[in-house]
Amino acid sequence: MNRVLYPGTFDPITKGHGDLVERASRLFDHVIIAVAASPKKNPLFPLEQRVALAREVTKHLPNVEVIGFSTLLAHFAKEQGANVFLRGLRAVSDFEYEFQLANMNRQLAPEVESLFLTPSERYSFISSTLVREIAALGGDITKFVHPVVAEALTERFKK
């Protein structure tokens, strides 16, 4: 069974992330969205809420599971029996970091391959950072995130 692990902070999960998950769900038997705690990134949403939002966005995909984690990614992949890391590349600027990450993961978990997918053109410019900035300034984010995520962002920035 091919099990792919799609790691990220997902703060918040965007339509770009969703696009990659949908496509991965057609390519792999089982997709694990691995939501990283990432305390050094100081996420807007707590881990539990990011996991819940990702579950809501992907609930229509029967072979997709969402799990939060706070361990080393290589260890988490082994625990989950994953044999592939899925990473998205929006632009050439993403490549250098992702290349370093793939090489480090290969050293830590040589049995897990790294696979890169590019998002659909209509989502290639979306990032969680931009979505948070637009939401914080009261902009319309409905084109970039699932309605439940837009609602959570709107609620978060009301405070």
From Swiss-Prot:
ATP binds at T9, F10, H17, G88, L89, R90, E98, Y123, S124, F125, I126, S127, S128, T129. One of its GO terms (biological process) is coenzyme A biosynthetic process. The record marks H17 as: Transition state stabilizer. The keyword Acetylation does not apply. It catalyses: (R)-4'-phosphopantetheine + ATP + H(+) = 3'-dephospho-CoA + diphosphate. GO terms for molecular function: ATP binding; pantetheine-phosphate adenylyltransferase activity. It comes from the Bacteria. Its cofactor is Mg(2+). Pfam families: CTP_transf_like (PF01467). InterPro entries: Cyt_trans-like (IPR004821), PPAT (IPR001980), Rossmann-like_a/b/a_fold (IPR014729). Pathway: Cofactor biosynthesis; coenzyme A biosynthesis; CoA from (R)-pantothenate: step 4/5. Its EC number is 2.7.7.3. Substrate binds at T9, K41, L73, R87. It is found in: Cytoplasm. Keywords: ATP-binding, Coenzyme A biosynthesis, Cytoplasm, Magnesium, Nucleotide-binding, Nucleotidyltransferase, Transferase. One of its GO terms (cellular component) is cytoplasm. SUPFAM superfamilies: Nucleotidylyl transferase. Disulfide bonds: none annotated. Belongs to the bacterial CoaD family. Homohexamer. Reversibly transfers an adenylyl group from ATP to 4'-phosphopantetheine, yielding dephospho-CoA (dPCoA) and pyrophosphate. This is Phosphopantetheine adenylyltransferase. It comes from Pseudomonas putida (strain W619).
